[in-house]
Amino acid sequence: MSQYFTLFRIEPAFDIDTENLEQTYRALAARFHPDKFASASAFEQKQAVMMSSTINDAYRTLKNPIDRAAYLLKTSGIDADAPEHTAFAPEFLMQQMEWRETLMEARAGNDLESLKNLDNEIRDEQEKLFCGLKQSFARQDYDTAAQQVRQGRFLDKLRNEISSAL
């Protein structure tokens, strides 16, 4: 199941060398680009398209810290997006409501400064979450990591909403 890590010759871990990921991606994408197989057999062309698709999927997954964490959990048999991991701690739920309220008010008032401040706050929360994920994986505390992935998905979604409003 650690196929993506194997493809990129990376040790399965949350904390990876993203520069190495990028370089390996470029090399793999160039090597298996479907255009290089234009004069090959139909079978080889199909294989190149499938390989190119797998490379792109793997890169997108490993590049995004939350997707990488979810994928890493799956390699350990834990589905972070399963219903049993959807509950949030009461403190995080309260914080979610505050952030949503701030976002609604800033949108309604077309307050770009508040939106930028909220975006900075959420980015800082994401950085803290990534540090927490690193620690959870180091301790092999996969239940906590699964909850952190769900929190990270919320933060990603909220930042996307903020970006749309800016």
Swiss-Prot record:
Chaperone as UniProt keyword: yes
Gene Ontology biological-process entries: [2Fe-2S] cluster assembly; protein complex oligomerization; protein folding
GO molecular function (one): protein-folding chaperone binding
GO CC field: iron-sulfur cluster transfer complex
InterPro entries membership: DnaJ_domain, HscB, HscB_C_sf, HscB_oligo_C, J_dom_sf
Pfam family, one: DnaJ
Entry keywords, A to Z: Chaperone
Ranges where the J domain occurs: 3-75
Domain of life assignment: Bacteria
Protein family: Belongs to the HscB family.
Cross-referenced HAMAP family: HscB
Summary of subunit composition and partner proteins: Interacts with HscA and stimulates its ATPase activity.
General function of this protein: Co-chaperone involved in the maturation of iron-sulfur cluster-containing proteins. Seems to help targeting proteins to be folded toward HscA.
Protein name (record): Co-chaperone protein HscB homolog
Lineage: Bacteria, Pseudomonadati, Pseudomonadota, Betaproteobacteria, Neisseriales
